Amino acid sequence: MTFLNDWFEWNGERSTAHGVYVLEQPPVTMPQERSKQTSVPGKPGSLTTLKGEDVYDDLTLTATCFIRDPARIPEITAWLKGGGTVSFANRPCGFYHARVSNQIPFEKILRGNPHCSFAVNFRCSPPFWYVSNPEEVTITTSSYVLVNPGSVYSEPIIHVYGTGDMTLIVNGSFVELEGIEDSIVLNSVIQEAYQGEMLLNEKMDGEFPLLKPGNNLISWTGDISRLVIAPNWRYLA
């Protein structure tokens, strides 16, 4: 017998395709802010110093699983390794970037029964990425307000269509673009500017744009015909 929440996906492959079924899903977990606690002589409590804005420690999310056929263990161990993306049946709307972070012991459930149970620990890097993101948002007029529905800043990929020298302004932060021919991509995820396979970092001056939760004012000067944005909305939990 199987249940609706008996799976997870690792690098796009569902666990049930490998004969792995989930007995217990990891709970939805809020990550912890990365901070330093300092005791202050003569005062109660401690002083908290944040180590950056919107910086959070990794989460360890554990899926407790079982398999019916131990002969598939070599196949499973070849699949469950390294890094990639993980999503869970109790939260199929998105994914984490993660690594498998534990040795996986396969233990027999009952003597004489071939079923084996095991736990997989995924060390997840917050935030949680929504898969229901709009693929693209097209903006054709300056002074446009783009609303980030997430709970943490996003790292967008912005395709700027235009020619010559221009300035992109996101929430008051300026990105100067010089000598552009037709278009340029500003990829805030990988911190690179390019067109196709050609790097164009030398044509950009300024910080790669981020989109904060809530309203984001986007405007420009110069010959920009449109922006096409992959927003990459994200959530803390």
PLM regions: where:
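Short, acidic/charged, Gly/Pro-enriched secondary-structure junctions
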Residues: 4-7, 64-103
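Solvent-exposed loop and beta-edge segments used for protein-protein assembly and interaction
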Residues: 55-57, 80, 112-116, 150-152, ...
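Intrinsically disordered, low-complexity segments enriched in serine, threonine, and glycine
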Residues: 130-237
